[in-house]
Amino acid sequence: MSRIESTFSSLKTQGRKALIPYVTAGFPFADVTPELMHGMVAGGADVIELGMPFSDPSADGPVIQKAGEKALSFGIGLVQVLEMVRIFRTKDHTTPVVLMGYANPVERYDIKHGAGASESAFIRDAAAAGVDGMLIVDYPPEECVEFSARLKAHGMDLIFLLAPTSTDARMAQVAQVASGYVYYVSLKGVTGAGTLDVDAVEAMLPRIRRHVNVPVGVGFGIRDAATAKAIGKVADAVVIGSKIIQLIENQPRDRVAAVAHDFLKEIRSALD
């Protein structure tokens, strides 16, 4: 059982829902991320999604795009992201970390760091750093059988996005390769957009669960405790990203972790 599976299993036994915050690695300061991750765990995070900065993030809204641009300006690449996870793991051996990003940097890392025909350098190094899963936004499920198998061989899960526009055929494809959990994008468009229709989410989840036998997390548009509580009643996990980025972006360095901690504590309290 992977660390992600174990976390969801434990939460289910307790009758609780997973709280999954997203932050961009290296934002708002290049060296604050491990400390920020610890602060989020102390605030009630069960799994952390760590964004890998990329210059052309097509699925990200303006808030997360801007965070990625700032991280890139600090020189944050995949080598630095893995080092952040490694530092986090020196004190936290239990909280799952999922890397979220795009195929291009991963493929460039493999070329640069000597991937073989049957091995991915990035998967190998991510496993060594203590990563638990990956969500590669632009990897279609039908092309991920080998990638998923390589991740599983290193004890990691492959997370996929589903959307209101996902067909039953697409859900069936995702079900064949997904593990850990799936992330239901509750709005059409990019991250941080629009307002969330809880009734529409509730109507969609049974359809997803007919195909997918892993937990379902819901994100995009969750900005406060009331919305998180409503989503927590129907989903297995609540994912929050853009709101956290907005809260921390203008904080002094010594307040970043505390601000994220306090916000997540409020969300955790509403979920429980």
UniProtKB/Swiss-Prot annotation:
Q: Which InterPro entries match?
A: Aldolase_TIM, RibuloseP-bd_barrel, Trp_synthase_suA
Biological or metabolic pathway of the protein: Amino-acid biosynthesis; L-tryptophan biosynthesis; L-tryptophan from chorismate: step 5/5
Q: Which reaction does it catalyse?
A: (1S,2R)-1-C-(indol-3-yl)glycerol 3-phosphate + L-serine = D-glyceraldehyde 3-phosphate + L-tryptophan + H2O
Which domain of life, per UniProt?
Bacteria
What residues form the catalytic site here?
49, 60
- Tell me the CDD domains matching this sequence: Tryptophan_synthase_alpha (cd04724)
Q: Which Gene3D superfamilies match?
A: Aldolase class I
Q: Keywords in UniProt for this one?
A: Amino-acid biosynthesis, Aromatic amino acid biosynthesis, Lyase, Tryptophan biosynthesis
Entry's Gene Ontology cellular component terms: cytosol
Does the keyword Amino-acid biosynthesis feature in the UniProt annotation? yes
Named from the GO MF annotations, one term is:
tryptophan synthase activity
Name the family the entry cites: Belongs to the TrpA family.
Annotated function = The alpha subunit is responsible for the aldol cleavage of indoleglycerol phosphate to indole and glyceraldehyde 3-phosphate.
* Self-association and partners: Tetramer of two alpha and two beta chains.
* HAMAP family linked: Trp_synth_alpha
Identify this protein by name. Answer: Tryptophan synthase alpha chain
Q: Lineage, please?
A: Bacteria, Pseudomonadati, Pseudomonadota, Betaproteobacteria, Burkholderiales
